[in-house]
Amino acid sequence: MPSSMSGYIPSYLDKDELCVVCGDKATGYHYRCITCEGCKGFFRRTIQKNLHPSYSCKYEGKCVIDKVTRNQCQECRFKKCIAVGMATDLVLDDSKRLAKRKLIEENREKRRKDELQKTLVQKPEPTPEEWELIQVVTEAHVATNAQGSHWKQKRKFLPEDIGQAPIVNAPEGGKVDLEAFSQFTKIITPAITRVVDFAKKLPMFCELPCEDQIILLKGCCMEIMSLRAAVRYDPESETLTLNGEMAVTRGQLKNGGLGVVSDAIFDLGVSLSSFNLDDTEVALLQAVLLMSSDRPGLSSVERIEKCQEGFLLAFEHYINYRKHNVAHFWPKLLMKVTDLRMIGACHASRFLHMKVECPTELFPPLFLEVFED
């Protein structure tokens, strides 16, 4: 049976439907009859307080009850309520009414919690269009990621005597070990080339103006190379593998030119090792870094921002699909984007130091082209 619905006009009422007791505008189905709020309240109070025995009519019970006269004769009004079919047994006493109200509130709260739980459990997964985007980005990464999943078998450890010992009488990371630096420069050109190739496999990147492409690549190159190294951190040997081939220790990377930046990359590697990222997640991180609309000098800011938003949404939905067993996985992973941006900024200032410390002929042309302003 429909319950009382005061406060709004229910959809089951016809437009301008009238109260069967007094003819005023009806508000709903009350105590088995279509009535107005006034007659509903009058009938409820009469029954709850047992007032009807005290009602008396001055005109022999023959009053006409309408919205003007309804308050003039309580007896005739009550008799009409009974005559049209209002049910006394449906009127609750105060204790039952409070219990019913409490039950309604509890049910409402339960529905609210159920809806919230449903939202939490049923996190959206990628749409068909997002799956297409995810596939493009993943294939771009796999095609440009040196050694792929076989990096552990293919890597070669940089000899321990290179770049391992701290430079005498120099602040930590202050001096550059030129032998280690020259080893790193051998792999820097192919590493940069792979980042460029990754970007060029993304249609949305290739559609941007050439000048914007250059700005985006110069901005993200160190960040993406650092990410690719960090996800190849090996806790057993405590090394990172650069460009999928050269395994180096923290000290070697530091003394070979990166200084304190090496600590940030190694710390990121240690942290990411617990995330168990797959190729798609690494690829999407790279795409988010690439499409950073806050790089100075860009002309297509809104377009790039829209691209990044598309990557982020697909990324979040993919994380939902993967169902990582880590609390707050998505926000924690997004923090790594901030860490990588910081690494890129630190490397920019470190590069100036390397220019002072290392002979110009040791710098590969592509290295200078990307990192010089």
UniProtKB/Swiss-Prot annotation:
3,3',5-triiodo-L-thyronine binds at residues 194, 243. Zn(2+) 1 binds at residues 19, 22, 36, 39. Residues 1-18 are annotated as: Modulating. It comes from Aquarana catesbeiana (American bullfrog). L-thyroxine binds at residues 194, 243, 347. Keywords: DNA-binding, Metal-binding, Nucleus, Receptor, Transcription, Transcription regulation, Zinc, Zinc-finger. 3,3',5-triiodo-L-thyronine 1 binds at residue 347. Composed of three domains: a modulating N-terminal domain, a DNA-binding domain and a C-terminal ligand-binding domain. Residues 19-93 bind DNA. Induction: By thyroid hormone. It is found in: Nucleus. The gene is thrb. Belongs to the nuclear hormone receptor family. NR1 subfamily. GO terms for molecular function: nuclear receptor activity; RNA polymerase II cis-regulatory region sequence-specific DNA binding; thyroid hormone binding; zinc ion binding. This is Thyroid hormone receptor beta. GO terms for cellular component: RNA polymerase II transcription regulator complex. Residues 129-373 form the NR LBD domain. A zinc finger (NR C4-type) spans 19-39, 57-81. Nuclear hormone receptor that can act as a repressor or activator of transcription. High affinity receptor for thyroid hormones, including triiodothyronine and thyroxine. SMART domains: HOLI, ZnF_C4. Its main location: nucleus. It holds the Pfam family zf-C4. It comes from the Eukaryota.
